[in-house]
Amino acid sequence: MKSAPAALRARGLVKRYGHVTALAAADIGLRPGEILAVIGDNGAGKSSLIKALSGALRPEAGEIWLDGAPVQFRSPIDARRAGIETVYQDLAVAPAMTIAENLFLGRELRRPGVLGRLGMIGKRRMLEGCMAWMSALGVDIRSMAQRVETLSGGQRQCVAVARAAAFARHVVMMDEPTAALGVREGNMVLDLIRRVRERGLSVILVSHNMPHVFEVADRIHIARLGRRVAVVDPRKISMGDTVAVMTGVQDPGELPPHVLA
């Protein structure tokens, strides 16, 4: 059976911090329109992998392809220009600004100026655009004109995810998007992640929350000691066996072929 082409693929990524190897010839393959969960213990290289794919760090070795073409990201700006958006744990939202202003942060819409110069920021256009986009994603927040500092943790996370999805053309990567959220707000974010996928974007989801991983992931990438040890189908493997492989209790080579993905 022919495998699906990769939307984003990396092979042999290496990154060291002094005597510590964060990425030890790490590989990853993300298929078009899927949610790929990346799991692993602390020190497995999950965050370093995301940073390498988003241009936040430059690996010492290895290759990255986007839609089949080789790419090199010298900075996060390069990755964003290529259509990859990333939501880190700090969210990078401005609490004192409105939801609409945060959605367009760094990409503000401006009114035409005199003699071709940049005009004033078009706040009304941004507000209208934000309302339309949030409605399309099913994000239920009372007013897009309210400040982010008035929102709950789950709502802030939704703003960050929606902003990434608004400008991504290929891939959205998320680092622990449901961390420290309660059940209701965690489910709200998971629903949004599903809707992002439904709009045709591929998603990489880094998470320690195994129930959340098994709820939304199409495939699970298991990392250990800086490299990929297995990719499994959450519909065919138990959570317990997945954790056993992740922690090194079970040899990934002993997994039955039908659970691999």
Kindly label every feature range from the protein language model:
Residues 2-261:
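Glycine-rich phosphate-binding loops of nucleotide-dependent enzymes
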